Curated annotation (Swiss-Prot):
InterPro entries, per the entry: DNA-dir_RNA_pol_insert, DNA-dir_RNA_pol_RpoA/D/Rpb3, DNA-dir_RpoA, RBP11-like, RNAP_asu_C, RNApol_insert_sf
UniProt remark on domains: The N-terminal domain is essential for RNAP assembly and basal transcription, whereas the C-terminal domain is involved in interaction with transcriptional regulators and with upstream promoter elements.
Annotated region (Alpha N-terminal domain (alpha-NTD)), positions in chain: 1-243
Protein name, as recorded: DNA-directed RNA polymerase subunit alpha
Length: 347
């Protein structure tokens, strides 16, 4: 499985022969809009900890979310004071405000208001949202009015990531009465992972990663792990110093000279694949390599009894022939018949 790129020889076995998970499964028994437990197996020994730790760090620190960045309470000049008719002092009110969880569908800062004139509890449901912002925990207690007084405030919401101290927010005016807030933007509240043994055939020296994610409801656990995986992929791809894809002129089944790659006309029986992989291809009515390479990886994984291990096995063989899945082979049937006639004439 050696691929020549210019003067370099790339050994694709370094990655093509590693065990990879067939898919990520979610345990439905405990699933909800804010909690998910995911199973990823099989993995090479040690990869469970490597992937689990990286995913946990990114999940907790790097995902975008919405949070309040400032509040202006009418009649209050600073946070170290009280309001007549309000049971809590301003510090406690602010702590409660920072617990409000939000979903926002725009990157532009939004201003929300709250105005209550009745005696009794004030909750997040009293915040007047707009078409871009949704309050996810409306039952959250904010304050208690002990008299028929007016509690009025203006709040600014922004998108961000991680934890941002109050003095680190950009563009907030330094005006009297505007209280800047420490903001926790992360939509992920908690992450835990464990690594267990996994079996592949008779071998048990593989990893099984259990990843558990809790969110605030503004992002589903599935999307949270998908975004985190994308972040990691984008960050580490810069280390790859070769073209891991088949070159562009090979994508249509032609070699550098423009000649049709004759490997396309091989029977799958000549590829020396495992019995399982060969049987899966036959059940999918694939008899020639040229028919195989026109299928995408996603299409192949939908084939009955066809898993990631078979996919990786076949992909490695194809790469060794300068081919890959998802190739465009124009008029393959016609080219195949022409090739057969040519072989017969030469015989």
């Amino acid at each position: 499985m050696l691929i020549k790129q210019g003067e370099r020889l790339i050994n694709a076995r370094n990655w093509s022969e590693l065990v990879k998970p067939d898919q990520i499964l979610r345990e439905e028994e405990t699933a909800s809009g804010t909690h998910g437990k995911f199973v990823c197996e099989p993995l090479e020994r040690g990869y469970g900890t490597t992937i689990g730790n990286a995913m946990r760090r990114v999940l907790l620190a790097s995902l975008q979310g919405a949070a309040f960045v400032s509040v202006k309470i009418i009649g209050v000049q600073h946070e170290f004071t009280t309001i007549h008719g309000v049971l809590e002092d301003i510090t406690d009110v602010i702590l409660n405000i920072k617990q409000v969880r939000l979903r926002m569908d725009t990157e532009e800062p939004q201003r929300l208001t709250l105005r209550v004139e009745r005696k009794g509890p004030v909750t997040a449901a009293d915040i007047v949202a707009n078409q871009h912002v949704e309050v996810l925990n409306p039952d959250l207690h904010i304050a208690t009015l002990t008299e028929d007084v007016v509690l009025e405030m203006e709040l600014e919401v922004r998108m961000g990531k991680g934890y941002v101290p109050a003095d680190m927010h950009e563009g907030l005016a330094d005006e009297i009465g505007l209280i800047k807030l420490d903001s926790s933007f992360s939509p992920v509240r908690k992450v835990a992972y464990t690594v267990e043994q996994a079996r592949v055939g008779q071998m048990t020296n593989y990893d099984r990663l259990l990843l558990e994610v809790w969110t605030d409801g503004s992002l589903t656990p599935e999307d949270a792990i998908a975004y985190s995986a994308k972040i990691i992929k984008d960050q580490i791809s810069v280390f790859i110093n070769f073209d891991e894809r088949v070159s562009g002129d090979m994508r249509n089944g032609s070699g550098e000279s423009g000649e049709v790659n004759e490997h396309l006309f091989k029977s799958i029986d000549d590829l020396e694949l495992s019995v399982r992989a060969t049987n899966c291809l036959r059940s999918a009515n694939i008899g020639l390599v040229g028919e195989l390479v026109q299928r995408t990886e996603a299409e192949m994984l939908k084939t009955k009894n066809f898993g990631r291990k078979s996919l990786d096995e076949i992909k490695g063989v194809l790469l060794g022939m300068g081919l890959d899945f998802g190739m465009k082979v124009d008029s393959f049937d016609k080219k195949y018949q022409e090739w057969k006639r040519k072989q017969q004439n030469e015989a």
